[in-house]
């Protein structure tokens, strides 16, 4: 919801050179479409990159143009490069100053660079970084080794996974060399719950690599054919251990637990054809279990229960092929989810007529609106942050991040009420309740040291 009307909008790019915005009723938003003059293949990232309190839309196009739009469709700024921007940009606070930087990759003939810029078009210090290999997918960004500094992970057509430090240097232990090119971006997740992120990426030889933060290989899964679209993360069977969901040219949708080394019972499931999309997860029917949504390239949309059995009314045949990842939201605020799917023929929105659940899950491409490709708690930071006095209920970003040795959260109440502040991990499990009390109206600051309930 970028225009503040309490209803979600749908934003997407197309091969006709336009970037579109529609409301929940299918009406084109004022200021849209926005023409960039070339194919728009990257999923837009959304975040407040200029610190004005409103979210901006960031996307790339095949003419080397990175566009930053205001929420009314007007141009905020443009950054031009030589080459193509096909992958989704990622938004992340690289320097800990409270502002989101924009990280994106390029494809220039057989070469490519990794860019990091500020919202005003200025290059982040020591960027761009010339990788010397083209990249057709975007970067993943997070703090891999819990050292308080961001890491940028990119996968290339040169059969490599690179990790770039925030100072522009290549992280020790990288690049990791595989045996074929990568057409999927990396996903970052703490699989073994040791406080450090693993890197997950699949190549065109069917190999799904799971790497530790230092570049050593932790696990390997072989599908026998190209892995495409992307890798999502979920705890489908609620055993406290994460599964990796992915598909590709083997026509199967996999749900693999790398810690146990096996696929879940009932998986993989047959999609009937190649898949180019990243699976997404959501509790569609409010039963407490997650459903998995995926599509094949011939336009068949599938929904499966957590155990691999088909969801009612699916599979569903759509007009046109599907080459992009669906997204799920309650667009019309009626208490059930809608599934939005872009096809080669247009945009399709499917209304799922069941009460929706509220489980934390991977509901869109790259896991979040910032397109960081990461599952975990991310607190925006600003050491000099001063909370405003809003006219409505307000929760501030946590600061500082990483907490040193703690982080603070400001909550503003417009009237006296009960405050309950709870911390959850990426699996949706309660970590700690740091406050549960009645409070007067006004500003309240709560501190968390990173401890759990124990």
Q: Language-model segments: what does each one mean?
A:
Residues 1-380:
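Extracytoplasmic/lumenal domain signature
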Residues 4, 72, 117-120, 355-358, ...:
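Short linear sequence motifs
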Residues 111, 359, 418-420, 431:
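Internal amphipathic alpha-helical segments of the cytochrome P450 catalytic fold
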Residues 321, 441-445:
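Short, solvent-exposed loop/turn segments in extracellular or other extracytoplasmic domains
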Residues 381-424, 433-437, 445-451:
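Glycine-centered coil/turn sites that cap beta-strands in beta-rich domains
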Residues 454:
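Conserved glycine-rich acetyl-CoA-binding loop
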């Amino acid at each position: 919801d970028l225009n503040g009307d309490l209803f979600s909008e749908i934003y997407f790019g197309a091969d006709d050179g336009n970037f579109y915005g529609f409301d929940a009723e299918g009406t084109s938003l004022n200021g849209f479409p926005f023409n960039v003059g070339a194919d728009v293949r990257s999923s837009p990232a959304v975040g407040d990159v200029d610190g004005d309190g409103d979210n901006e839309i960031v996307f790339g196009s095949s003419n080397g143009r990175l566009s930053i739009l205001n929420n009314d469709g007007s141009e905020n700024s443009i950054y031009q490069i030589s080459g193509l921007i096909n992958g989704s940009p990622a938004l992340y606070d690289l320097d800990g100053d409270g502002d989101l930087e924009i990280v994106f990759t390029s494809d220039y003939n057989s070469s490519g660079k990794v860019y990091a810029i500020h919202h005003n078009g200025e290059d982040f210090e020591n960027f761009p970084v010339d990788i010397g290999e083209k990249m057709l997918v975007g970067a993943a960004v997070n703090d891999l080794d819990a050292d308080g500094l961001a890491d940028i992970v990119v996968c290339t057509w040169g059969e490599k996974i690179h990790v770039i430090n925030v100072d522009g240097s290549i992280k020790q232990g990288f690049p990791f060399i595989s045996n074929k090119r990568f057409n999927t971006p990396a996903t970052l997740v703490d699989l073994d719950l040791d406080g450090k992120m693993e890197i997950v990426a699949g190549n065109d030889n069917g190999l799904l690599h799971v790497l530790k933060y230092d570049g050593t290989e932790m696990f390997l899964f072989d599908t026998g054919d190209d892995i495409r679209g992307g890798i999502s993360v979920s705890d489908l069977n609620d055993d406290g251990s994460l599964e990796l969901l992915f598909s590709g040219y083997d026509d199967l949708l996999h749900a693999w637990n790398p810690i146990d080394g096996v696929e879940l019972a009932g998986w993989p499931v047959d999609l009937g054809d190649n898949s180019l999309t990243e699976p997404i997860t959501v509790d569609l029917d409010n039963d407490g279990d997650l459903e998995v949504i995926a599509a094949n390239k011939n336009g068949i949309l599938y929904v499966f229960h957590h155990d691999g059995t088909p969801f009612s009314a699916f599979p569903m045949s759509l007009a046109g092929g599907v080459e992009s990842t669906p997204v799920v939201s309650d667009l019309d605020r009626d208490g059930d989810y809608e599934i939005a799917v872009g096809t080669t023929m247009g945009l399709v929105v499917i209304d799922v007529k069941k009460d929706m659940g509220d489980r934390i899950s991977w509901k869109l491409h790259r896991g979040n609106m910032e397109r960081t490709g990461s599952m975990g708690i991310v607190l925006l930071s600003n050491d000099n942050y001063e909370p405003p006095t809003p006219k409505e209920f307000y929760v501030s970003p946590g600061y500082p991040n990483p907490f040193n040795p703690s982080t603070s959260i400001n909550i503003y109440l417009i009237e006296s009420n009960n405050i309950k502040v709870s911390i959850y991990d990426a699996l949706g499990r309660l970590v700690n309740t740091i406050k549960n009390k009645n409070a007067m109206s006004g500003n309240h600051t709560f501190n968390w040291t990173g401890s759990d309930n124990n």
